[in-house]
């Protein structure tokens, strides 16, 4: 077992905690061609656990200068609307939502055909020039930071995503 999170959700509940419904590691894990497993260490920090195929922790890749994106009013409306849609159609039965004031530090992890790690983080779609879809941090196969790579293509970074194919291509997934 590489990582585990136990969430106890009791119904009826008066409080729903964001971390119970949206844990970081299942949403942003990647499997390398050599069997290594890459997962965020937690929700709040830019730290990627790298596990060997036998489950032992090999290393943690960090970016100490990284500051997680703090949600503004628009971000809070978006995440609140998402939780309200999960809660059902009757607002009278909704619990209170315990939502974080930051986005997840690491939004997605990808491993390309060369074994390089691409990190999509909470700032990947923020403060980027017009025409840039997402910015990624690129690490070599040893976990050494190489550079920021910006993807210039059509797309909505909130609703669209990418998948890295083993042959070097990147697939844009709309919607």
How would you name each of these model-derived features?
Residues 1-175:
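Eukaryotic scaffold repeat domains enriched in small/polar residues
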């Amino acid at each position: 077992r590489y990582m585990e999170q136990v969430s106890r959700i009791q119904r009826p509940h008066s409080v729903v905690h964001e971390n119970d419904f949206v844990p970081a590691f299942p949403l942003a894990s990647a499997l390398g061609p050599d069997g290594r497993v890459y997962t965020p260490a937690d929700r709040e920090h830019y730290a990627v656990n790298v596990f060997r195929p036998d489950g032992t922790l090999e290393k943690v890749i960090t970016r100490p200068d990284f500051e997680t994106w703090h949600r503004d009013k628009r971000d809070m409306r978006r995440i609140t609307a998402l939780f309200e849609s999960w809660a059902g159609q009757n607002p009278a039965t909704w619990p209170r939502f315990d939502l974080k004031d930051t986005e997840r530090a690491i939004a997605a992890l990808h491993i390309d055909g060369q074994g390089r790690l691409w990190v999509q983080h909470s700032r990947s779609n923020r403060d980027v020039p017009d025409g840039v879809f997402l910015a990624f941090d690129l690490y070599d196969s040893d976990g050494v930071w190489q550079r920021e790579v910006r993807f210039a293509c059509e797309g909505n970074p909130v609703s669209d995503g990418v998948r890295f194919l083993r042959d070097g291509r990147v697939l844009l997934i709309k919607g």
